[in-house]
A protein has these predicted regions:
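Structured alpha/beta or helical-core interaction and ligand-binding surfaces enriched in interleaved
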Residues: 1-149
C-alpha cells in the first residue's frame, strides 16, 4: 500500500490517519500508551486529532481509516508517556472539553483506562485487558473535578 502525506503533519498509512506534533521522539517505547475514544464519524475523528495536535495536547494522535478498514466504527488514540502526569491532565481535559468521555445514564463518567503500548503488543484486548492507569486516579467520576491539581 502507498503512503499518503497530507499537510505538514498528517500521514495516511495502513488503515490509520497519523497526526504528528514534531515532538513524537519524546515518546518512550517502554512508557508510551494512549487514551482512546471510539467513533463512527471519520471526519469528526480527523478533525479532533488535528485539534489535539494543534493545541499541544499530545505528541502523536491517530484515528482509524474507516475506508480502508471497512468497519462501521474506529478508534482515536492520544499518545503520551504513562509517567507524564501533566500530559495525562492535558489529554483528559481535552477529552472532557470535547465530550470524548462517555457518561452513564446517571451522569457519571465511565472509568476509562489508559492503555500502554506494551499491553497492545502483548495482545491484551477486551476481557484480557486490565488498565493500570484509570480515569478515577485523576478526576472524581461523579463531578469531573480534578482529584489533585
Amino acid at each position: 500500500m502507498l503512503n499518503y502525506y497530507f499537510g505538514g503533519n498528517m500521514i495516511r498509512d495502513l488503515g490509520w490517519f497519523w497526526f504528528l506534533s514534531g515532538k513524537e521522539d519524546i515518546l518512550d517505547e517502554e512508557k508510551c500508551g494512549k487514551w482512546m475514544y471510539f467513533f463512527d464519524d471519520q471526519e469528526f475523528a480527523q478533525k479532533i486529532c488535528q485539534k489535539a495536535i494543534d493545541e499541544g495536547v499530545c505528541y502523536e494522535c491517530k484515528c482509524s481509516d474507516m475506508e480502508i478498514t471497512r468497519q462501521p466504527t474506529g478508534v482515536i488514540c492520544f499518545y503520551l508517556n504513562g509517567d507524564d502526569i501533566e500530559n495525562h491532565k492535558r489529554v483528559i481535559q481535552f477529552m472532557m472539553k470535547n465530550d470524548l468521555i462517555r457518561k452513564t445514564k446517571a451522569g457519571k463518567y465511565y472509568n476509562n483506562s489508559f492503555k500502554f503500548d506494551n499491553q497492545t503488543r502483548a495482545g491484551e484486548y477486551g476481557a484480557d485487558f486490565e488498565g493500570k492507569i484509570k480515569l478515577e486516579q485523576f478526576i472524581d467520576l461523579r463531578t469531573g473535578e480534578w482529584i489533585y491539581e
